[in-house]
Curated annotation (Swiss-Prot):
Annotated family: Belongs to the shikimate kinase family.
Annotated disulfide bonds: none
Residues binding ATP, per UniProt: G14, A15, G16, K17, S18, T19, R120
Name this polypeptide is given: Shikimate kinase 1
Cofactor note: Binds 1 Mg(2+) ion per subunit.
Catalytic activity: shikimate + ATP = 3-phosphoshikimate + ADP + H(+)
Annotated metabolic or biological route of this protein: Metabolic intermediate biosynthesis; chorismate biosynthesis; chorismate from D-erythrose 4-phosphate and phosphoenolpyruvate: step 5/7
First-level EC class: transferase
Underlying gene: aroK
Cofactor dependency: Mg(2+)
Annotated compartments: Cytoplasm
PROSITE patterns, per database record: SHIKIMATE_KINASE
């Protein structure tokens, strides 16, 4: 059986962090948190409203504080926001307090998975622009890789299969 260590999922929007995170938590009998949902719960406001009011910098500050608090818990699965790794402090905290799993996916798959999502603030202004996703990937992928203990492609498999693969990898000594 897997010891109850924290599992932190990082990766771009549309990689499946929330869906896979819920499945992992359920299968491993762990508590699940989604940093975006927790910010909304704590503030009573949705993320796009926070972005409108405080800008990305204000949102990232809130996110950094929340992730620091959540990662102090034991035995959790945490799905982080795609841009959370922009903060050096957040990268350090994630690396130090659990197993970081980078859910990797292609820009094409991101476009498909996010096409109907109206709740992502960064997509509100640019829509489904491949160049936007390419810019984010160029900026963020090296940061995901920097802190990843495990890299899992989510491209060609169902999220259920990806969750099973992660559990299998975590069970290895």
């Amino acid at each position: 059986m897997i010891e109850k260590r924290n599992i932190f999922l990082v990766g771009p929007m549309g990689a499946g962090k929330s869906t896979i995170g819920r499945q992992l938590a359920q299968q491993l009998s762990m508590e699940f948190f989604d940093s975006d949902k927790e910010i909304e719960r704590c503030t009573g406001a949705d993320i796009s409203w926070i972005f409108d009011l405080e800008g990305e910098q204000g949102f990232r500050y809130r996110e950094e504080i929340l992730i620091n608090q959540l990662t102090e818990k034991k035995g959790i699965v945490l799905a982080t926001g795609g841009g959370s790794i922009k903060s050096k402090e957040t990268r350090n905290v994630l690396s130090a307090r659990g197993v970081v799993i980078y859910l990797e996916t292609s820009i094409e798959k991101q476009l498909i998975r996010t096409q109907r999502d109206k709740k992502r603030p960064l997509l509100q202004s640019v829509g489904q622009c491949p160049q936007f996703f390419q810019t984010l990937a160029k900026e963020r992928n090296p940061l995901y890789e920097e802190i990843a203990d495990i890299i899992i492609p989510t491209e060609d498999h169902s999220f259920k299969i990806v969750a099973k693969k992660i559990i299998h990898l975590l069970e290895k000594p």
